[in-house]
Amino acid sequence: MGAKPAIAESVARSALVEAMRAGDSVRGLTSPNPPVGAVILNAEGEIVGVGATQPPGSAHAEIMALRAAGERARGGTAVVTLEPCNHTGRTGPCSQALIAAGIAAVDYLHADPNPVATGGAAALAAAGLKVRQVSAPDAAGVSDALIPWLLSVREQRPHVTLKFAQTLDGFTAAIDGTSQWITGTQARQWVHADRARRDAIIIGTGTAFADDPSLTARYPDGSLRENQPRRVVIGRRDLTAAGDVARNLRRLGYEQYPSVEEALVGLYAEGARDVLVEGGAGLASAFLEADLVDAISAYVAPVLLGAGRGVLDRALVQTLALAPRFHRVETIALGEDVLIEYAR
């Protein structure tokens, strides 16, 4: 394949941003496969195809983008958020599809850590394509949808986000147990959109008994979103003998595990790669004690209580030097509330 002038760096960066947005749009729909985004640029550097991973067993992102581009892909560049796969599973290898389409160059963001699928970059280079791994762009409002999946491959368990809503002085409920609602409408709507991007929502039996949650993902009008995460309860208490308690979960269906470790093992084996822990305080403490929290979504409301229930129900450490620390990833204003995203 003949040499081709490199596309402008600004064009390549813009294409990567579009690919990341495409991947982010399918979070919650692809597990156990990664939510990948792909963009095809023609030989002049114009976007002619955008694709994202389809549900398991369907087309990968590169195939969707190539279908959209058609013959315009020939001599062009593929920009992908994950190294194109090089194996045949339920679908064929994306590396070979890119070669067959006449693609001249490939930019990819993350190397594929899956030993079964890796090798795409080497196969593309061996076929004469210009291949390079690029870094993530510093673009506002663009998130890397692959971070949970990458961790799940590395750790062989789902990525865990601990989510809670608290007052300015750190309480999740008043002394009498009331907590609805600490945050405002915008924050609660954001939570429902976030739930739809996860493979499972996890609560403890205490929360199941006390709050009778549905653990659904809904639109602002109350209707159910298309993607509903699995409902998971951790604890040994039997919800089926609960009488009038936990009726919503018994009506909608749920899975139950005795411990956090067994839950993550079971969920990973069944294809979950990205889970959200919503409480309560005992469960949050258990996940942190087991060093199994990878990210935190803290919704902070401009409310003061002075006393009440906290995010955790016990001390994690005896001295500050040993406390687990996270770094801030993003801060999002949601009406009068603030969502602060942290990661390890």
Predicted segments, located by residue:
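Short capping loops/turns at secondary-structure boundaries
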Residues: 113, 117, 153-157, 180, ...
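Active-site beta-strand termini and strand-to-loop segments that position acidic
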Residues: 42-43, 154-155, 343-344
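Zn2+-dependent cytidine deaminase-like catalytic core
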Residues: 39-141, 286-288
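Generic alpha-helical secondary-structure signal
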Residues: 18, 68, 97, 144-145, ...
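Proteins enriched for Cys/Gly/acidic motifs involved in redox and nucleic-acid/cofactor modification
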Residues: 28-32, 121, 130-165
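Enzymes that bind and transform nitrogen-containing heteroaromatic metabolites
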Residues: 2-33, 49, 90, 122, ...
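Charged/polar, solvent-exposed surface patches and flexible loops
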Residues: 21, 67, 126, 144-151, ...
